[in-house]
């Protein structure tokens, strides 16, 4: 399974906190849940456009919007500190950028965990053809 993880990270191009985001997702679901979201709907994975397909995809849309708000912080590259207190993910950074990016990832991981029942395998590796609509505003 470790080899699969390494291969997947190479294929999608690991950047700074992507591994951290994956661990937060796994903390709110079962191990290796992150793989389900590598290319899902119109927003889970790299980039995004169109209308989110379901609540799961909307979590990724909101995450993209959150990253857009902290753009000056290089959200895909910044590494942050986090921990767990009474079963909850807690961002442990005093640096504004690190804390903001951690919060984006924390909220998205919680959202994905709360909406796992909306996950539709039919939206995995969805063609961009189905995401051609004008994107919603953040």
Swiss-Prot record:
Gene Ontology cellular-component annotations: extracellular region
Residue pairs linked by disulfide bridges in the UniProt entry: 42-131, 44-60, 59-111, 65-138, 66-104, 73-97, 91-102
Gene3D superfamilies assigned to the protein according to its UniProt record, in alphabetical order: Phospholipase A2 domain
Tissues in which the UniProt entry reports expression: Expressed by the venom gland.
Pfam family, one: Phospholip_A2_1
Active-site residue numbers: 63, 105
Keyword tags: Disulfide bond, Hydrolase, Lipid degradation, Lipid metabolism, Metal-binding, Secreted, Signal, Toxin
Cofactor: Ca(2+)
Gene Ontology molecular-function annotations: calcium ion binding; calcium-dependent phospholipase A2 activity; phospholipid binding; toxin activity
Residues engaged in binding Ca(2+): 43, 45, 47, 64
Known catalytic reactions: a 1,2-diacyl-sn-glycero-3-phosphocholine + H2O = a 1-acyl-sn-glycero-3-phosphocholine + a fatty acid + H(+)
Cellular compartment(s): Secreted
Presence of the UniProt keyword Disulfide bond in the record: yes
Cofactor stoichiometry and binding remark: Binds 1 Ca(2+) ion.
UniProt EC number: 3.1.1.4
GO biological process, one term: arachidonate secretion
Signal peptide: 1-16
Chief place where the protein resides: secreted
Record's protein name: Basic phospholipase A2 DsM-b1/DsM-b1'
Naturally occurring in which organism (per UniProt): Daboia siamensis
């Amino acid at each position: 399974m470790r080899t699969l993880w390494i291969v997947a990270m190479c294929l999608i191009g690991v950047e700074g906190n992507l591994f951290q985001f994956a661990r937060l997702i796994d903390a709110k679901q079962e191990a290796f849940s992150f793989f389900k979201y590598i290319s899902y709907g119109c927003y889970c994975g790299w980039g995004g456009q169109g209308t989110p397909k379901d609540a799961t995809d909307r979590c990724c849309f909101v995450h993209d919007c959150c990253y857009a708000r902290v753009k000056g912080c290089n959200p895909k590259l910044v590494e942050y500190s986090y921990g767990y207190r009474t079963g909850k993910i807690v961002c442990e950074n005093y640096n504004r950028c690190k804390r903001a990016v951690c919060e984006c990832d924390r909220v998205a991981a919680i959202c994905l965990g709360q909406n796992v029942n909306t996950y539709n395998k039919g939206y995995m590796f969805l063609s961009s053809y189905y995401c051609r609509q004008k994107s919603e505003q953040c």
